[in-house]
């Protein structure tokens, strides 16, 4: 680590899921300290684990805000809900609109000034991180369904015992 730089290891998984491989030396990125147990929570919980990428399709100013529209794959969009959280390039934002192909967020002046988001343009790729809660719920429901299916397949009932000569 130096006065104006730091080094970090990057895993192949990060390269596959993110736009990191398309950045060049000197590219600006958004960095934030990790949350500690003493930290006051004042916003969305962001883990830094990228779920995939999206493409900015539109940026338009409205009064003091900028609307940003992003398209993404269904595997990412399924976790995005209106008024829920989405992280774009490490910036935690609230979703204003979502449909089957895209979502929209509104960038307030403070976010515009303190992050790199408005240096992007239509056609640029952005990293996306969805709210973790939706992924946990989906996983839990999958396991509940799988467990029920497995239990019904191997349940020992009186008819099972009779079919196999035990009654």
Show where each model-derived region lies.
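Conserved loop->alpha-helix
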Residues: 1-167
């Amino acid at each position: 680590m130096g006065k104006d730089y730091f080094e970090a290891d990057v895993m192949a998984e990060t390269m596959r899921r993110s736009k990191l491989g398309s950045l060049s030396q000197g590219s600006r990125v958004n960095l934030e300290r990790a949350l500690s147990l003493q930290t006051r929570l004042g916003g969305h919980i962001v883990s830094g684990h990228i779920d995939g990428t999206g493409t900015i399709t539109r940026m338009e100013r409205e009064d003091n805000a900028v609307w940003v529209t992003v398209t993404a794959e269904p595997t990412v969009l399924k976790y995005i809900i209106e008024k829920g959280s989405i992280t774009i390039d490490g910036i935690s934002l609230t979703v204003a609109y979502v449909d089957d192909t895209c979502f929209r967020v509104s960038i307030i002046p403070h976010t515009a000034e303190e992050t790199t988001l408005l240096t992007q343009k239509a056609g640029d790729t952005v990293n996306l991180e969805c709210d973790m809660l939706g992924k946990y719920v989906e996983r839990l429901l999958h396991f509940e369904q799988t467990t029920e299916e497995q239990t019904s397949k191997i349940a020992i009932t009186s008819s099972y015992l009779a079919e196999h000569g035990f009654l």
